[in-house]
Amino acid sequence: MTYNELKSEENKYVMNTYGRFPIALDHGKGATLWDVEGKKYIDLASGIGVNCLGYDNPIIVNAITEQAHKIMHASNLFTTEPMVQVAKKLVEKTHLNGKVFFANSGAESNEGAIKLARKYSFDKYGEGRYKIVTLINSFHGRTVTTLKATGQDRFHNYFFPFTEGFDYAVANDFDDVRCKVDDMTCAIMMELVQGEGGVLPLDPAFVKQVEALCREKDLLLIIDEVQTGIGRTGSLFAFQQYGIRPDVVTMAKGLGGGVPIGAVLAADTCCNVLTPGTHATTFGGTPMVCAAANAVLDNVGDPKFLHEVKQKGEYLKNGILALGKDSIHGVRGMGLMLGIIVDEGKHSAYANKLIENGVLAITAGKNAVRLLPPLVISKDEALSVMAKVF
């Protein structure tokens, strides 16, 4: 079908919940995509950080195919080998000595972390200690609870009443965080690079102070690595570059390399809090998606691969800055999670212009063109187009 034919059918049958770009994607290879009209695009979005190993990668395709011939789904009333393997790899590669709960998305993973934190506190201190401090400009999901955890007022509409129990502090302002913590607080939850908020890395000194506060007050430190995790920043998880030890790490996006999976990794401080009957999901940890996740971790977890991600990120960042364009006010981020800073309100226009020139990019915050390419992208694939656009 042509784009116009597909769009007509979409308008008729699909809920209008997304502001879509005017293209219909058909297939891909590596870091390149083609639409239904045959136009070629360099992908700097990777499905919002999902397709970490690119498209038609035999590593992923073979893992999924082989597992599909065995068993695609099994109830969590039974044990399956791919699930156990993924959990073991996550625990061993993070040195948190904990355990994993599997979910289907980032929002579900964050919901699980919120439940875990509240039960941890309930078990130790009883009722009344349930509040969680998050950061202004954060994003933690689109369920009724994770929307409320999100520190952006524009998301707090329509769906009243939201889940109570969230306070918001200014990022990189430790005094404000300390002021927001009281006797009813059970956890602090943060993204180390605020993705939807504008690709804003947190200050390492601030993060260390927050960790120390959590230890002082017996609060769980929850690090939302839904977007930063699985090699995106040049380490398997961003917290490893900050030198901290979280109690809980949430993840999704790149973990499945293109198939839906999320996970809650709890350290030894709290990994036995959730028990039978307190949390569950039908599809979490199903064999086929875990087969894909195993393939991803075997490759992205390689130190050489992660070093190359850092190198590519620096090369792309420096190459963009070297263009010397007045329209570019800076580039921020870590690894291959970058934001090109432009005039406020102009980021969507630049993203559209990139698409016209055969590059897929997305936006973040009020002034960032967000780059989240497949981690396998070559160094030079995107730079040639940037000069035409900015």
Task: Please identify what each model-predicted range represents.
Residues 1-390:
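Conserved N-terminal phosphate-binding loop of PLP-dependent enzymes in the Aspartate aminotransferase
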